[in-house]
Amino acid sequence: MCLHSYCAHLFIYIDRKTAEKARIWRYILFGLANQQNMINFVSRNELERMKMTKTEQYAQLIPQIKALIEKQTNVVGALCNVTALLKEAFDYYFWVGFYIVKDQSLQLGPFQGSVACYTIAKGKGVCGTSWDSQKTIIVDDVEQFEGHIACSSLSRSEIVVPIFKGNEVVAVIDVDSKDLASFDEHDAKGLETIAQLVAPLF
């Protein structure tokens, strides 16, 4: 191959490589632009949430939960939707679900989150203790709770709220967080209100 022909092929190769790089950069920049738009959209939603207190967030959910469960005969579906709504609303919720009293133990019900324990005995763990004491329990650090049942190693703090039918506990709402001390009296009040709303389903 003569020098002229070699140079011509070299220029064509360089031009092709340049065009390919330009095409790749266009994809990258276009993708980043779309990603930035998505980030901006998420940020706006997060800012709206940040403006609200926990009490306001729970208050906003109450009418939505009422609408979801009103005259609903599909109990499992209704409880699934309640857990989905709660997990979507609060970013510090790692796991949220129901444990239902059956055969003298708490049986796993509808939930959102990672794989969970199937059965919890009365008086055992945070859920079993809440059932036994008939009280809401807030645990800032689950590792410091005697007899804690570690369904997930990612769980750091927890709140459990009993659901009553008359004077009897028929289920509990269990919520876990990956962070320490995520729950307070505002969560307790909000979840206790929700427990009253869903009680007729049991």
Q: Locations of the language-model features?
A:
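Regulatory loop-to-helix N-cap segments in sensory/regulatory domains
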Residues: 176-194, 201-202
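A short, aliphatic-rich beta-strand micro-motif
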Residues: 157-164
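Intrinsically disordered, low-complexity terminal regulatory regions
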Residues: 43-110, 198, 202
